[in-house]
């Protein structure tokens, strides 16, 4: 993402992994870098610009020819290939509240395909910090 505010910032990469209940990898989906124009990239603050420059993502964004729509369609096809029942699988990851907001804003078909529940590992990290 180019920042943390849906509506102002945009998605620049989407990657998907499918795991079983024991978090064993079942399938690795496409890792897609989404082209964004100069107007969208101008919304990045210095921290995000520096991070995306250091890790090479900014260069990949410029070089990409993948649209958000194409990335969403490829991701949705991957999910449907591996998940037979709509809304049966939660979104899992780190600090995914932000991811959910961006999915709802830009890729609602993916947001609606996933279960409303989430597994956010940042919650586990915060609990471990407080309980230890």
Please provide the spans of the model-predicted regions.
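Short, flexible loop segments at boundaries between secondary-structure elements
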Residues: 115-132
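Short, well-ordered beta-to-alpha junction loops that form the rim of enzyme active sites
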Residues: 92-97
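Amphipathic alpha-helical interface surfaces
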Residues: 67, 71-75, 88, 99, ...
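Conserved non-catalytic scaffold segment of RNase H-like nuclease domains
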Residues: 2-91
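Substrate-recognition/cap helix-loop segment adjacent to the acidic, metal-dependent catalytic center
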Residues: 82-83, 98-117
